[in-house]
Structures are given as structure tokens and as C-alpha cells.
């Protein structure tokens, strides 16, 4: 593929609810533009964009894919994003690389939660928005019902461009409201002009909707509209184009991807409606001092690019997908990674069509491509010229709120699992992985059950590692509520030097996260040189509480008496004596189990606020407050025991149909209710006996 100036490059992110047909629309475009020699079908597992084995198996996109086409002198970079909520990280990546968002809507199912979330993501990224109502060959499709829902949901900016003429449930004639011409589609994508169908007042009403939208783009056109004067075709084209670019108009196209009906009309309009990479304007980055810097889409400027996606595959190697904002990226252009501060050597650059790689001389300003073998570079990094160091905006990923413990099927493979999950997290930064040294578990977090299920599948398919998920353990604590004194006496005689240590220690509650050690020994009952050994013995002992084996916190231990033997006493004997004092005394100090409490901030629609508050109470939580967040959304703040939050991500998604989200973080420890504590203690004892 030849190189294009940024003025002739369009970067389009395809988004929408799962199953709306966005990948099918993209495949239809690739086929029409001869970028693919077949019309890929998801059901057949032969699409260009859903090429991953997991995508083929699940018949759904789970990661962002890229494919460029050439259409009437314009390069269009298609960025296909996932529709499943569990893979929303891919949407964030796609929106970061795009200048326009095409939101695909099912003609049968209409506007869904995924439609709303796609619009929200596009708005957050500041992108131009367009709609495509797909699947109109389905007899259950209802274009005009869907169109009215789009207008009522997203406002008067929604403007029809191409509409179907439906007879007996069949939509093979489409009217372009710009040129007021009709086109008839037949088998194998055949298309021919046809007479305007008799659609009664509907057609004129749709045409009037365009005029109203155009009138809003300038005072001059508004005056003309109010005076009842007709717009010229040129004024309509310019008005709509301006309105689309400034966001006051969201054009609606339609068709059927499986039959390639009206796809050409969308492409023809796209070339003059969508803002080019150059037209989007400059990005604002920051320099080394944190000061804002304008980075313009200029082919002759210093290089600056954002890495918006990473592939780390054991078979094809590592690929970093980049959107070049300024300058160009090529093997002869030196760049540095602004996160690491180190230079990155570029051996070659690629154009990606799904998984197919094609060498290219360079990736120019406004364009998208990939760089192989950048080992230290991660998604979200900025690559730029050392002559002009700048950090571009990264990627705002959704919070990974669903956590599970991960165990290898084969004992001893823990390191293999950790390394493999780390590589998967390089590809998908919404995968979080930590080793909890307290519970001795590896914990993996993601966006939902299906997300982590894919992780398990990929561990097997990519790295031949079998692993399983289970509910993570909770890091409880133990403390005391009563002051006691206890003796620890250790004596061992077995020929030669023996072992002797004797201590009296006072234990009492104290405001500390671990152990406060003190001494008030008089008369040398315990020599000072053994004090550190006593403290060490206690610090080792508190790692395992007397109730359920959890660490003991909030305790002060004061060494106040004891005895020693001038020959047999040693650091080891006093260390052991201290641990015996702990074991003898703590059971009498009213030991108490503590549970971790977290702060919950749930953002949900107004209609779900009562459900969420009720669920918080059911989970032993306390609602701390509520506040409106605008647009019919409320933020519920609460404190909830961490033990009750394992499946909260699933609950909030189900109750809000995917509209809700939440953040949850540890706050403090509190006394565990007696009935809950008893279950925890019994479970700990049962595990210890296994």
C-alpha cells in the first residue's frame, strides 16, 4: 500500500453492543475495497479481523484489530473493537488511535447498553461520531424504530443520511438523502441506480431533518432556513460536513453487511464527511518539566507516536501498534521511550491487516502501523525523537474489579503461571496480577468472569499451562482485647551445653499495625544482650495467630522479668522462650478476629440506586452517602467487608445491565462478627488438617 498524507487518512474505530455486527460491517468494507479476497463470516471463522483462536471459538471480538483500505484516493484505517463488556480495554485502545467512532447498531435489537457505552467512550475521547444500522435484510429488523430511538436517546444531532425502502420485509433499495437518489442492490453486491420510491411524507420528512441539522451549523444557513429558502446541494454537503466534524451532527447510515447492501454509500460519504487525521488538530502532550506542549499532525516535525496496543505471542513475537501523531517512524529515525528514557531500535515497520504483516518504508504522521521486537515498550508508552521529548496522553483503561485466585494444575508451576500471565498482561493491561504473600496465593484481576476465562484458555493454548480459578482467600488479622501476663520458659538438657531461657511478658492492646516491643527488666533478670532475641521471637510468633493462624496486630509486649543461665542461655533459647510466652498468654487475652473493610464507590443509574443500597446492606456493608453524577447517574459510597465483595462485579453488571461500575479499595480492619468469625476459624482449622 502506498504512503498517504495525513489529509487523506481516516482512522475509524468500530464500536457497539456485542452481536450488533460491527466486525461484519468491517469485513464487508474490506471485501468491497478488495483488501480481502473473501467476505469473511464470523460463523465460518474466516474473518480477517477476528483471527485469534479464542475469537473464532467464541464467535466474538475480544481484542482490537486493525486493517487499512484504500477508497477513492483515501486511506481508511479500520480499528475493530470488542463489544463484550469484559473486553472493554480494547475499546479504550481503539478510541485512542481513532479520530472518528462508527457506532454500529443492530437493526433488529436496536439501541443497547453497548451502544450507550460506545457513545460515552467516543465522547470521552473527543471523537466524531457516526451510526450504522446493520442487518436490515433480517425480516425482524426495524430501521425507523431504531432511528427514532437513536434520536430520543442521543438527541437532535442524530441525522439520517441513508435510509431503506422496505417492501414485504425486504430492504434492497436505499435512498441517499444527500443526492436524493435511490440505489437497488442485488446478489453478490450488485448495485444499480433506480427511481426514487414512493415513500410518502416520510422521505420529505427525513430530508427536512437534514435541512434542520444543516441550519444549525451557521447563522447564515439558519437565516436562510427560517426564511423558507432552499439550500443548494453544495450548502447541504458543506453544512453536514462541518456539523459532523464539530460534533453537532451525528449521521446515520444503514445497510446489511452480510449482503454488502449500502456499504458503498457509507464509504463514499465517509471520504468527505469524516475528519482526516490532519483535520483533528494538534494533541496536547507534556514536556520533561510537565508543561503542556502542542504536538501537531505534521509530517515534517519531530517524531512522536503513542503505542495503543501490544501483541506478545510466543509464535509471532512481540508487536507494538502505534498511532503516529507527528513526524514519521522508520528504521532510520532514532526514537526514545519516554517511560524508560532509553532509546528503542526500530528494525522495520509494518502495516497490519488483521494478523497479516506487510513491510512498509515508514509510518507517517496521522497513520497507524506496527513495530516488531520492542522488548521494553508497553501499551500507553510514547515513542518520540530525542530532539523533542514529549509524553502523549496514554490510555484510560476501565478498572479491573473482578478478582480470582489462580492455581496451576501441576504443583511447582507457579513461576510458569506468573511469567505467562505477565506476558498476557502486556497484551491486555486490564489484566492485573499480584502474589499475595499473606494468603500464599496468586491473584488475577480482570473485567469479568468471561475475561478471566479467556486468560485460562490462553494460558493453555499459548503456553501449554493448565490452571484453575477459585475464590481468593481473605487476609484476616487477629488482635487482643485484654491485658495479660504470661511466662515462657524453655529448658533443654541433652549433654554438653543445654538451652535455657525464661521470660515474663505483659501483653496488652495497642494502636499499631504490628507489634510494639518494650522492656522494664530490673536487676538484670534478663541480660540486655538477650532483649533483641526476645523481640525477634515475638515478631516471629505474631505471624501466626492463635485463633485461625492469621497475623496478630495491635499488640504491645513488655518484657518485665525472667531468668537466665550463665552457660546454657543463648539467643535461640530466649527467642524460643518469647514465642512460648506468646502462645501461653494470647489465648487468655480475649483474642479477636479482624476482617478487612473496603471503601466502595459504585456509579449506577438512578433507577438502580435502591437495588445497590439494598445489596450493600445484604453484604454487611454501611452506606456512607449518595451524590448525583449527572445524566441520570448516582454515586453510592459505602464501606463493605472485603469477604463479601467476591462476586459484586457480577451483581452490579447484571442489575444495571452493564451500565454500572465501581471502585473498591482497602480502608482498615474491624472486629469480625462472632458468627462470621466462627466460620473463618473452622475453615482455617479444616485447611490446616488437610
Question: What are these regions, as identified by a protein language model?
Answer:
Residues 1-690:
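Structural and coupling elements of P-loop NTPases
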Amino acid at each position: 500500500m502506498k504512503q498517504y498524507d495525513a489529509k487523506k487518512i481516516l482512522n475509524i474505530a468500530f464500536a457497539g453492543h456485542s452481536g450488533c455486527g460491527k466486525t461484519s460491517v468491517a469485513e464487508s468494507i474490506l471485501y468491497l475495497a478488495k483488501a480481502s479476497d473473501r467476505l469473511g463470516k464470523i460463523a465460518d471463522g474466516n474473518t480477517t479481523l477476528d483471527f485469534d483462536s479464542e475469537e473464532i471459538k467464541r464467535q466474538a471480538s475480544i481484542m482490537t484489530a486493525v486493517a487499512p483500505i484504500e477508497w477513492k484516493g483515501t486511506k481508511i484505517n479500520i480499528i475493530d473493537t470488542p463489544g463484550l463488556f469484559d473486553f472493554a480495554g480494547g475499546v479504550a485502545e481503539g478510541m485512542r488511535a481513532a479520530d472518528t467512532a462508527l457506532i454500529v447498531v443492530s437493526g433488529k435489537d436496536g439501541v443497547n447498553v453497548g451502544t450507550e457505552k460506545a457513545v460515552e467512550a467516543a465522547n470521552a475521547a473527543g471523537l466524531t461520531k457516526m451510526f450504522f444500522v446493520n442487518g436490515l435484510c433480517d425480516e425482524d429488523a426495524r430501521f425507523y424504530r431504531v432511528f427514532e430511538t437513536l434520536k430520543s436517546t442521543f438527541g437532535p444531532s442524530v441525522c439520517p443520511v441513508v435510509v431503506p425502502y422496505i417492501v414485504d420485509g425486504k430492504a434492497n433499495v436505499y435512498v441517499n438523502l444527500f443526492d436524493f437518489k435511490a440505489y437497488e442492490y442485488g446478489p453478490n453486491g450488485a448495485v444499480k441506480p433506480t427511481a426514487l420510491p414512493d415513500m410518502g411524507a416520510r422521505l420529505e420528512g427525513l430530508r427536512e431533518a437534514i435541512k434542520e441539522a444543516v441550519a444549525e451549523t451557521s447563522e447564515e444557513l439558519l437565516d436562510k432556513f427560517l426564511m423558507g429558502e432552499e439550500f443548494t446541494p453544495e450548502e447541504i454537503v458543506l453544512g453536514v460536513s462541518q456539523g459532523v466534524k464539530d460534533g453537532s451532527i451525528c449521521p446515520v447510515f444503514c445497510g446489511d453487511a452480510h449482503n454488502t447492501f449500502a456499504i458503498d454509500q457509507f464509504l463514499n460519504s465517509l471520504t468527505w464527511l469524516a475528519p482526516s487525521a490532519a483535520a483533528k488538530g494538534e494533541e496536547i502532550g507534556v514536556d520533561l518539566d510537565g508543561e503542556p506542549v502542542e504536538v501537531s499532525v505534521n509530517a515534517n516535525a519531530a517524531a512522536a507516536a503513542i503505542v495503543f496496543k501490544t501483541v506478545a505471542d510466543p509464535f509471532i513475537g512481540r508487536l507494538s501498534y502505534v498511532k503516529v501523531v507527528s513526524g514519521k517512524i522508520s528504521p532510520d529515525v532514532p526514537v526514545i521511550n519516554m517511560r524508560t528514557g532509553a532509546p528503542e531500535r526500530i528494525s522495520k515497520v509494518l502495516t497490519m491487516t488483521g494478523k497479516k504483516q506487510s513491510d512498509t518504508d515508514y509510518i507517517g504522521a496521522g497513520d497507524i502501523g506496527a513495530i516488531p521486537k520492542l522488548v521494553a515498550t508497553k501499551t500507553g508508552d510514547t515513542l518520540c525523537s530525542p530532539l523533542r521529548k514529549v509524553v502523549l496522553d496514554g490510555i484510560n483503561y476501565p478498572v479491573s474489579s473482578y478478582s480470582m485466585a489462580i492455581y496451576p494444575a501441576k504443583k511447582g508451576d507457579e513461576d510458569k503461571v506468573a511469567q505467562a500471565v505477565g506476558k498476557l498482561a502486556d497484551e491486555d493491561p486490564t489484566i492485573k496480577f499480584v502474589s499475595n504473600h499473606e494468603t500464599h496465593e496468586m491473584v488475577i484481576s480482570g473485567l469479568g468472569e468471561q475475561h478471566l476465562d479467556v486468560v485460562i484458555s490462553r494460558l493453555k493454548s499459548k503456553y501449554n499451562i493448565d490452571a484453575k480459578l477459585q475464590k481468593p482467600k481473605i487476609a484476616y488479622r487477629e488482635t487482643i482485647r485484654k491485658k495479660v501476663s504470661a511466662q515462657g520458659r524453655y529448658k533443654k538438657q541433652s549433654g554438653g551445653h543445654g538451652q535455657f531461657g525464661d521470660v515474663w511478658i505483659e501483653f496488652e492492646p495497642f494502636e499499631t499495625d504490628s507489634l510494639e516491643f518494650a522492656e522494664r527488666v530490673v536487676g538484670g533478670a534478663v541480660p540486655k544482650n538477650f532483649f533483641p532475641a526476645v523481640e525477634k521471637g515475638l515478631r516471629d510468633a505474631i505471624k501466626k495467630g492463635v485463633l485461625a493462624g492469621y497475623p496478630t496486630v495491635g499488640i504491645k509486649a513488655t518484657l518485665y522479668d525472667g531468668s537466665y543461665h550463665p552457660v546454657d542461655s543463648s539467643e535461640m533459647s530466649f527467642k524460643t522462650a518469647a514465642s512460648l510466652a506468646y502462645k501461653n498468654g494470647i489465648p487468655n487475652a480475649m483474642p479477636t478476629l479482624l476482617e478487612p473493610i473496603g471503601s466502595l464507590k459504585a456509579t449506577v443509574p438512578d433507577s438502580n440506586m435502591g437495588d445497590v443500597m439494598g445489596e450493600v446492606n445484604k453484604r454487611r456493608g454501611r452506606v456512607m452517602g449518595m451524590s448525583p453524577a449527572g445524566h441520570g447517574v448516582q454515586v453510592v459510597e459505602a464501606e463493605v467487608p472485603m469477604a463479601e465483595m467476591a462476586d459484586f462485579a457480577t451483581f452490579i453488571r447484571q442489575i444495571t445491565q452493564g451500565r454500572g461500575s465501581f471502585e473498591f479499595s482497602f480502608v482498615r480492619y474491624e472486629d469480625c462478627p462472632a458468627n462470621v468469625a466462627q466460620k473463618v476459624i473452622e475453615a482455617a482449622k479444616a485447611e490446616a488438617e488437610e
